Amino acid sequence: MATKTYNAGVKEYRSTYWEPHYTPKDTDILACFKITPQPGVDREEVAAAVAAESSTGTWTTVWTDLLTDLDYYKGRAYRIEDVPGDDTCFYAFVAYPIDLFEEGSVVNVLTSLVGNVFGFKALRALRSEDVRFPIAYVKTCGGPPHGIQVERDIMNKYGRPLLGCTIKPKLGLSGKNYGRAVYECLRGGLDFTKDDENVNSQPFMRWPQRFDFEQEAIEKAHGETGERKVHYLNVTAPTPGEMYKRAEYAKELGAPIIMHDYLTGGLCANTGLANWCRDNGMLLHIHRAMHAELDRNPHHGIHFRVLTKVLRLSGRDHLHSGTVVGKLEGDRASTLGWIDIMRDTFIKEDRSRGIFFDQDFGSMPGVMPVASGGIHVWHMPALVNIFGDDSVLQFGGGTVGHPWGNAPGATANRVELEACVKARNEGIAVEKEGKAVLTEAANDSPELKIAMETWKEIKFEFDTVDKLDIAHK
């Protein structure tokens, strides 16, 4: 007759994974989840279930728990808070011991923290609101290949935001016509142009031809203007091997920066590419295509501030951040919060901006936020005020949509940028006095004057879907 050697069966998660008196360690990875439980499910039980299913637990007791120090390795739900203005959900705070995760692998961290637990039947919805990475874990990650200061030195441009443009139409141009569009934008006054996120290697424009014509445009514009000019060459590809092949070719051409779609391309590929860029002296621009599928639902998914932290650890020198004023989602307070996460060494907990934990990045370089998406000349004063100097302001349609063409569109943006920076430096409240600043600058710039007339009625005044919970109070 078999002898029962351990307490088999199913027991409540809270008996093992709910520890309200636990004090998180400096080395713990901390997570804040917004949990919407199924009707009738107890808060403490479902918080403990999230801690269990995202760490060591499963649905039943297993005898192999006796072969390890479960109390050391388990995640612990240690605090529950109400969500302001929403009684259908609550915040649960979970602490994970650092040894649960492979060093330097945000892939491994996300596999646990936002893995199978998001499909748990006891939950109607689950959202990762914030994560605190301890400095002990941060130090195991490569981070940005170079960072803000190195990019400034490469570009030899200081004291203002960098100015860019996404080439439009994003799809359908031949390589030669694409290169022509790049040249016109750069000679008109832009610092950067870029491939759009879905420009890879399609039948109408294969990547080698695009790279060749882009580099020709860069060199011609540089020769004419005497300024350093750059284009982000998108190396996103079907396989890692093909991605590195394109990156190597960009390097051979002399391009200083390449681009990657980090979510569709994958975090494993992104970390590898960041390491390659560090070793080869290349800057890395990151597009966030697919992010809104993950982060826009206020009750389920992964908040963009979490994706921002993860990508800073994985590695990039630029990241698209939204604009506040353009066509894409993102309120001012939240956007300022994740801009700080990109650039600052230490970010203090600040619920008014959606930041739930202190975050220390130590000596890890900062990252340039990229404002892009539906912006034009009338937005410049607000963008200069919101983003400051260490940023890239990227006007796609707001450059190539100019009635006189790409070069005049670029000139209009360069004139207004310099006018706004000058006004700010003179102590003028540039966002408040923006109309006067632009009107004065337009007196000496017909390109700016016609741009202001063209887009004077264009606004994107839609309510934000993913509001800060503090705003509901």
Swiss-Prot record:
Keywords: Calvin cycle, Carbon dioxide fixation, Lyase, Magnesium, Metal-binding, Monooxygenase, Oxidoreductase. It catalyses: 2 (2R)-3-phosphoglycerate + 2 H(+) = D-ribulose 1,5-bisphosphate + CO2 + H2O; D-ribulose 1,5-bisphosphate + O2 = 2-phosphoglycolate + (2R)-3-phosphoglycerate + 2 H(+). Substrate binds at residues 116, 166, 170, 288, 320, 372. RuBisCO catalyzes two reactions: the carboxylation of D-ribulose 1,5-bisphosphate, the primary event in carbon dioxide fixation, as well as the oxidative fragmentation of the pentose substrate. Both reactions occur simultaneously and in competition at the same active site. This is Ribulose bisphosphate carboxylase large chain. The basic functional RuBisCO is composed of a large chain homodimer in a 'head-to-tail' conformation. In form I RuBisCO this homodimer is arranged in a barrel-like tetramer with the small subunits forming a tetrameric 'cap' on each end of the 'barrel'. Its cofactor is Mg(2+). The record marks 327 as: Transition state stabilizer. Heterohexadecamer of 8 large chains and 8 small chains. PROSITE patterns: RUBISCO_LARGE (PS00157). The gene is cbbL. It comes from Hydrogenophaga pseudoflava. One of its GO terms (biological process) is reductive pentose-phosphate cycle. One of its GO terms (molecular function) is ribulose-bisphosphate carboxylase activity. It holds the Pfam family RuBisCO_large_N. HAMAP family: RuBisCO_L_type1. Binds 1 Mg(2+) ion per subunit. Belongs to the RuBisCO large chain family. Type I subfamily. Mg(2+) binds at residues 194, 196-197. It comes from the Bacteria. The active site is at 168 (proton acceptor), 287 (proton acceptor). InterPro entries: RuBisCO (IPR033966), RuBisCo_large_chain_AS (IPR020878), RuBisCO_lsu_C (IPR000685), RuBisCO_lsu_C_sf (IPR036376), RuBisCO_lsu_fd_N (IPR017443), RuBisCO_lsu_N_sf (IPR036422), RuBisCO_lsuI (IPR020888). The modification N6-carboxylysine is found at residue 194. Its EC number is 4.1.1.39.
